[in-house]
Amino acid sequence: MVTVRPTEKGQATALFAVVVPVTVLFFLGVIDYMITNARVMETVAAADLAAHAGAQQINLLPDGTIEPFSSQASVVATSFFAAQAPPEASLGGISCGLIQERPACRVSARVRSAGWLLPETWINVNAVGYLAYGVTEDDQ
């Protein structure tokens, strides 16, 4: 009569079959987060630069008053955003004028998430660039 001893054969295979997919999903999630975060940071930087560039176009009148509604401000902000934004970003809108009783430009944009693990979604980004008194384009 042959005695069969229980062995641990196959235990490593079962553990491998469980651990590998979980590890792969974890790393896909990390990569998805990193790519999405990089895209959002680039879009925030482009929107911030565009908002400040637009704010610098606000006119300072000879009597010291500020004329906040400049037609050039939106054009300059749009061109700065187009030059600096990542390809996944799209410009939502630009409004220049008085924001919280201060001359400024507001830039809104959207950027797509990576969509590797989680479904691809749009992330909204807003930036406001205030005019620092005494710092217009002519002063630089």
Go through each PLM region and give its residues:
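Alpha-helical assembly-interface signal, strongest on the long, hydrophobic N-terminal helix that forms
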Residues: 2-74
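Short, conserved structural patches
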Residues: 41, 60, 64-140
